[in-house]
Amino acid sequence: MLELKNIYKTFNPGTINEKVALNGLNLTLNEGDFVTVIGGNGAGKSTMLNAVAGTWMVDEGQIIIDGIDVTKLSEHKRAAYLGRVFQDPMTGTAATMGIEENLALAKRRGKTRFLKPGITKKEREEYKELLKILGLGLEDRLTSKVGLLSGGQRQALTLLMATLQKPKLLLLDEHTAALDPKTAAKVLEITEMIVNRDHLTTMMITHNMQDALTHGNRLIMMMEGKIILDIQGEEKKKLTVRNLLDQFEKASGQEFSNDSALLS
């Protein structure tokens, strides 16, 4: 479903601020993989997601999504294959529009140049059923402005919008990092439910090692623009945070320096 072949990306090359962000990165995701991505600050996690999304072009290498070479495609054209949720709950929704209007935008994205006038009764019932699954009471607030929602409600709505058209690949860039622990747990529960229900191939960046172990069927750890650990299946299920830290230290020869990753 996703192939990253020998990907390189350097920012500010030839200057005092030169930074090698991706350094010969290779990764293959099978259809239905739910991969959690961890690593210290500057490891290349977000750069990898941005490279896949086309936010910036890679210097070398090849990116293939569902058998299609998208390496040279613009971010706009790649959006047809992708769903994405960012860290900031304010990103991904239109604050001044109603919940149902936001869902209508997501549903019609890429299908027509102009929005249809109004929302049909059939669409409204469909949105109610979709929102009911979230368990947040939003199905009774279809006309409420999204700007009035809590951060958790808004992020759950963004997640629903990002997956409405069943994307080939779902990218989650620390999408619970700005939420309180209780709300983050709820959004992760919703994430797991949607990903499993729709069999979505997913990459989820997190700084929380326990979340990385709890969710998904596969875990990768990055360092200096490369993948240094790739754990899946039964091996992943048996891991503890301590085991994971030990494996990191063995693979890298360093201690893991990001204390926030130890939170559970």
Question: What residue spans do the PLM features occupy?
Answer:
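The feature captures the beta-strand-to-loop junction immediately N-terminal to the Walker
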Residues: 38-40
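H-loop/switch region of ABC-family ATPase nucleotide-binding domains
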Residues: 206-207
